[in-house]
Each structure stands twice: as structure tokens, then as C-alpha cells.
UniProtKB/Swiss-Prot annotation:
Organism of this sequence: Shewanella amazonensis (strain ATCC BAA-1098 / SB2B)
Similarity section: Belongs to the heat shock protein 70 family.
Function, in words: Chaperone involved in the maturation of iron-sulfur cluster-containing proteins. Has a low intrinsic ATPase activity which is markedly stimulated by HscB.
Classification via PANTHER family: HEAT SHOCK PROTEIN 70KDA
Protein name: Chaperone protein HscA homolog
SUPFAM superfamilies: Actin-like ATPase domain, Heat shock protein 70kD (HSP70), C-terminal subdomain, Heat shock protein 70kD (HSP70), peptide-binding domain
Gene Ontology biological process terms from the UniProt entry: iron-sulfur cluster assembly
GO molecular function annotation: ATP binding; ATP hydrolysis activity; ATP-dependent protein folding chaperone; unfolded protein binding
Keywords noted in UniProt: ATP-binding, Chaperone, Nucleotide-binding
InterPro entries found in the cross-reference section: ATPase_NBD, Heat_shock_70_CS, HscA_NBD, HSP70_C_sf, HSP70_peptide-bd_sf, Hsp_70_fam, ISC_FeS_clus_asmbl_HscA
Disulphide bonds in the chain: none
Length: 619
């Protein structure tokens, strides 16, 4: 494990010097920035005392506006006022145009097919729009904290892919902001509640925002969060509650929602009523429209009846996510509530009824993600108690396992920040194989012989199936202390075996540097050796499979056919001993052509045996 001390070049790290770092919740609807001050993580307000910044950017002829100012024009200048840009991150223009949702923007395609918004300020891409949202948040943080930032932790949805994550990092880098880490939003929420320290088990994060709903099922093990399943609805949120309540009020007052200007006023009043009903049982809705005043008393029961179906949809998504994760609701230790819409009493009561315990709600659900990100940022820049080392841990050399032919399959790449968990599936090589040996290695080379051996262990109790039929999931997990745990589990039976090792033990910085230099020096040679080894493994697999097939069904072949196949097998076995990968591939292809007829006969024979004794009606 590489332990990188955080300090200016030529200076020692000063434990007493507080380094400025922030956590940013770059949300679909709203964004926030938070920092740890005097030991407490808090969101930062702007000059007007507002903590939340609407994630809206307007590109007008006279300039660019962001947040509340841009929001004022979202209805009157929709074509140039970009909302929910997070939905466009990492997506191609073709994907957007193929979707069912229609947008008021004028799009063009970039050279690589990504969307460009055509605005009075010129063409801008989603990364640039996101940077404009980040800009006032960064400025707010530097003004409040009184100095330049050393970096930021930015949160992203757990389901974001590599392109979406990279786009988020690029947005920060456009502003010259160092991204300390991208943190999954549900993980940030769990960190805010301190669930990352000491507790182990399954955690659910229920995130109901203004426009989207997300449910994440996480497993926490020794400080590492593993995302087991995600789900939700990208078109369901608190705004839908407002629309239902606004429609109800319009109906009670005999108003037509199609009337110009009425819709926005109704939505504003509906939101006020919704928020008031979280604290009281009855609220009077009021509206002044076209010189007339309207009033109507609404109780919580009426509101609950209006939104009940939508809340049930979120619970159904929770049920699906648990099923995908293979978890029962009773196994969930804690449920974390995220998003302003989780303040609605019906939402909280339904979540409590489903999971069987009261959810965690003590931290403002609008701010919990930003607060968790701020805590993580504070740790990453080294703001720990004086007794602690100021360390940023990364994996200095890739971690992997040996596969057939002495090859290395890398599971965790070097320079990955820890804690981390990665998993990959493997299968058996021989028919009836009931055990599998695992060799854990470290290094950047392609062959095991050139890497560092860390540990060996064996998984026993694999069902005796045909080669390739068993599924063994291998999980590498590195905790915050650099301890590597490798677990192998056969999926159908659940039988497992594991081992722990400290990858950094006995490795000096010089040895790490030497291993990296060797990997670059021998890169071309290593690739050639890997290609040869892969062909040799494939040859062995083909021969093993054919030996098994002939042992069962050689009676299907004439003597001449059997001799031809045997000769081709002998040729492949001989060629595979050499060092010509292309020659081995050619021999495999010749043997494949030679056995086509045999494969067809075996298939016909299997079908005849399966149908033997079956009537037409049964079939």
C-alpha cells in the first residue's frame, strides 16, 4: 500500500494546519457545498443565507446566470435555460433523441457524437454547463472559508457509468478544482450518519428528490461500501406531489390549468402547502388569480390520499432492489433518508413499515449527501487529530489472480484509492471439477512468474458439473488499513473460502518503482508471451473437451473419421508445445473444422435420446 503524505514539496506535513476542502452535492435539481468547520460538517450558505443552489444555467445574450436568477427565466426562456443537465452527462445525442422525453433546447452533435446546446453564448456541452453550476459553489466556499481549496469530493449517483463520472471530474477540472474523489451519493449519506465506522451489514439509502427517486442497497464490511443493487424511477419525485396537489386545488376552485400563468402559481402554492403539512395536520391553501381570492382547507389525510399511489411505487422499487440484491427487508440494519421529499410523513411511515424500523432522519435530508462528502474531503486532505498520520492511501501495484497458463487476471488496478471492493466471475476448466486453487498476485506484468506472490487458498465443494458450467465469484476487498481480503464463492451452493493479506508488507518504495519500470520495459515482450500462453490454454481446453467427448461418443464415428480427428489432436498437442501463437491458432481452427461433423452427430444423438419414449402429445 502506498502511503502518500500530504505536504508541500520540501516541507513536512503540519498536523495543526487546517487544509481547506469541500464536499459538493452536484444534484439534478439542486446543488450544495459543505465543509468541516470546527470539527462539524455543515453546508455553506450564500450572501442571502441560501444553502441550496438550483442546478439551472441560463445562457442569454447579455450573459450567463446560474441558480435562483436563472430559475426566474425557466418558463419564459426555456430554450436557453438548461435544467437537470445531470441527465445529459455522458450520454450521446443519439441516445437523447431516441428517448421519449422532449426538450426545449436546440441541439447539435460534437465530433464524437456528444450533445451540444446551441445558445446565444455559443455552443456548450453538459460538462461546461455543470462547470457553471460548480463555479458559484466553489466561490461561495472560498469566500466563506477564507482561502483557496485544496480539493473537493463530488458526489455522483451509484449507477453513473465511467463516462458520466469522467464528465463530472472534467467539469471541476475546467475550474481548476482538484477532485479528491468521486463519491457515490448513497455512500456519502451513510458516511454522514457515521455508518462507515464500526458497523457491518446491509444499509438501504432511500433518495426521493424533486424530480427523481433512487434506492440503493449497500453492504458495509470493514469500512468498504459495496453497492449490491440500485433502482428507482428517474421521472418520480416531489414535483409530482406538487402537480397532484395543484390539480386537486384547481378542481376544487373550478380553475382551468391550461390558463396562462395559472400553472406556475398553483405549483408554488401546492409546494407551500405540502411543506406545511409535514409540520401540521391542516393547512389553508390560498391563491389570488385574475382579481379573485381563493381559499381551501386541506388536511394531511387528503394529501396522503392524493400521493399514496406514487409512494407505493417507490416501495415497489425498494422491493425490486432487495430482490436483485438477494436480501430480505429484515436484513437491512439501517435506512437512510435523502432528499427533501422524504420529509413527507406518509413517505416516512411507508418506509418504516416496509423495512420494519424507523429510518434515519436526524440530518437534514436535503443536506445529508453534501455533509457526507465534506467529511470524506476533510479526511482525504489530512485534517485528522494530531495523533493520526496524514495519509492518503492508494494501491501502488495491481492486484489479481493466476489463471490457466500462468496468466494474471487483474482485479484491482494500481492507483485505485482505498477502501475498495471489486468482483469478477470465473469458471471451471475440467468436467467434474470440485475444487479450485487460487493464487493471489501483485504487479503489472502479464505472467505470474514476473509478479509478486501474495497468497494461495483453495475453494472446495464445487458441484461436479461440466467444464465452464460452475460460476465462482471472486471478490477482492481492500479496507482503509490496506488489508486485502479475497473471497471465492460458488454461486449455486454459496460455498466459499477466503484469505487475508497485507499487500504492502515488505515492499519498499524503491521496489515498487522497480516493478513499474520493469512492466514498461517489458510491455511488448509480455504481450507476446501472454498471447502465446492464451493460445496454449485454449489448445489444452479444446483437447480436454475432445478427449471427454470421444470417451463418451466415439461409437458415432467411422474408423476413418476417428483416425482423422486423432491425428488433428496429435498435431495440435505437438504445435502447442512450441512458441508460435499463430501456428497454435491455425491448428485449433483445423481441428475445429475436422470435428464439425462429430459435433453435429453428438447433437443429433442427444436429441434422439431426449425424445426416446416420448409421445407426440407429450412433446
Amino acid at each position: 500500500m502506498a502511503l502518500l503524505q500530504i505536504a508541500e514539496p520540501g516541507q513536512s506535513a503540519a498536523p495543526h494546519q487546517h487544509r481547506l476542502a469541500v464536499g459538493i452535492d452536484l444534484g439534478t435539481t439542486n446543488s450544495l457545498v459543505a465543509a468541516v468547520r470546527s470539527g462539524e460538517a455543515r453546508t455553506l450558505a450564500d450572501a442571502q443565507g441560501r444553502h441550496s443552489l438550483p442546478s439551472i444555467v441560463r445562457y442569454a445574450k447579455e450573459g450567463i446566470s446560474v441558480g435562483q436568477e436563472a430559475e426566474l427565466h425557466s418558463a419564459t426562456d426555456a430554450a436557453n435555460t438548461i435544467v437537470s443537465v445531470k441527465r445529459f452527462m455522458g450520454r450521446s445525442l443519439a441516445d437523447i433523441e431516441a428517448g421519449s422525453q422532449r426538450f426545449p433546447y436546440q441541439f447539435s452533435a460534437s465530433e464524437n457524437g456528444l450533445p451540444l446546446f446551441n445558445t446565444p453564448q455559443g455552443q456548450v456541452n453538459p460538462v461546461q454547463v455543470s462547470a457553471e453550476i460548480l463555479r458559484p459553489l466553489i466561490a461561495r466556499a472560498e469566500d466563506t472559508l477564507g482561502g483557496s481549496l485544496e480539493g473537493a469530493v463530488i458526489t455522483v449517483p451509484a449507477y453513473f457509468d465511467d463516462a458520466q463520472r469522467q464528465g463530472t471530474k472534467d467539469a471541476a477540472q475546467l475550474l481548476g478544482v482538484k477532485v479528491l474523489r468521486l463519491l457515490n451519493e448513497p455512500t456519502a449519506a451513510a458516511i454522514a450518519y457515521g455508518l462507515d465506522s464500526g458497523q457491518e451489514g446491509v444499509i438501504a439509502v432511500y433518495d426521493l428528490g424533486g424530480g427523481t427517486f433512487d434506492i440503493s442497497i449497500l453492504r458495509l464490511n470493514r469500512g468498504v461500501f459495496e453497492v449490491l443493487a440500485t433502482g428507482g424511477d428517474s421521472a418520480l419525485g416531489g414535483d409530482d406531489f406538487d402537480h397532484l396537489l395543484g390539480g386537486y386545488l384547481a378542481q376544487q376552485w373550478g380553475l382551468d390549468l391550461a390558463d396562462t400563468g395559472l400553472g406556475r402559481k398553483l405549483m408554488i402554492e401546492a409546494r407551500r402547502v405540502k411543506e406545511a403539512l409535514t409540520e401540521t395536520d391542516t393547512v389553508t391553501a390560498t391563491l389570488e388569480y385574475q382579481g379573485q381570492a381563493y381559499h381551501h382547507d386541506i388536511d394531511r389525510g387528503t394529501f396522503d390520499a392524493l400521493i399514496a399511489a406514487l409512494v407505493k411505487k417507490t416501495i415497489a422499487a425498494c422491493r425490486r432492489a432487495l430482490r436483485d440484491a438477494g436480501i430480505d427487508a429484515g436484513e437491512v440494519l439501517e435506512t437512510v433518508m435523502v432528499g427533501g421529499s422524504t420529509r413527507v410523513p406518509l413517505v416516512r411511515s411507508e418506509v418504516e413499515a416496509f423495512f420494519g424500523k424507523a429510518p434515519l432522519t436526524s440530518i437534514d435530508p436535503d443536506r445529508v449527501v453534501a455533509i457526507g462528502a465534506a467529511i470524506q474531503a476533510d479526511i482525504l486532505v489530512g485534517n485528522k487529530p494530531e495523533s493520526d498520520l496524514l495519509l492518503l492511501d492508494v494501491i501502488p501495484l495491481s492486484l489479481g489472480i493466476e489463471t490457466m497458463g500462468g496468466l494474471v487476471e487483474k482485479i484491482v488496478s494500481r492507483n485505485t484509492t482505498i477502501p475498495v471492493a471489486r468482483a469478477q466471475e470465473f469458471t471451471t476448466f475440467k468436467d467434474g471439477q470440485t475444487a479450485m486453487a487460487f493464487h493471489v498476485v501483485q504487479g503489472e506484468r502479464e505472467l505470474v512468474q514476473d509478479c509478486r506472490s501474495l497468497a494461495r487458498f483453495t475453494l472446495k465443494g464445487i458441484p461436479p458439473l461440466a467444464a465452464g458450467a460452475a460460476h465462482i465469484r471472486v471478490t477482492f476487498q481492500v479496507d482503509a488499513d490496506g488489508l486485502l481480503s479475497v473471497t471465492a464463492m460458488e454461486k449455486s451452493t454459496g460455498v466459499k473460502s477466503s484469505i487475508q493479506v497485507k499487500p504492502s508488507f515488505g515492499l519498499s518504495d524503491t521496489e515498487i518503482a522497480t516493478m513499474l519500470k520493469d512492466s514498461m520495459k517489458h510491455a511488448k515482450e509480455d504481450i507476446s508471451r501472454r498471447m502465446l500462453a492464451e493460445q496454449q490454454v485454449e489448445a489444452a481446453r479444446v483437447l480436454e473437451s475432445l478427449h471427454s467427448a470421444l470417451a463418451k461418443d466415439k461409437v458415432l464415428l467411422s474408423e476413418e473419421e476417428l483416425n482423422d480427428i486423432t491425428a488433428a489432436m496429435a498435431e495440435l498437442a505437438e504445435v502447442a508445445k512450441g512458441d508460435d501463437a499463430d501456428a497454435i491458432l491455425a491448428a485449433i481452427e483445423r481441428l475445429d473444422n475436422q470435428t464439425q461433423e462429430f459435433a453435429a452427430k453428438r447433437m443429433d444423438n442427444s436429441i434422439r435420446n431426449a425424445l426416446k419414449g416420448q409421445s407426440v402429445d407429450t412433446i
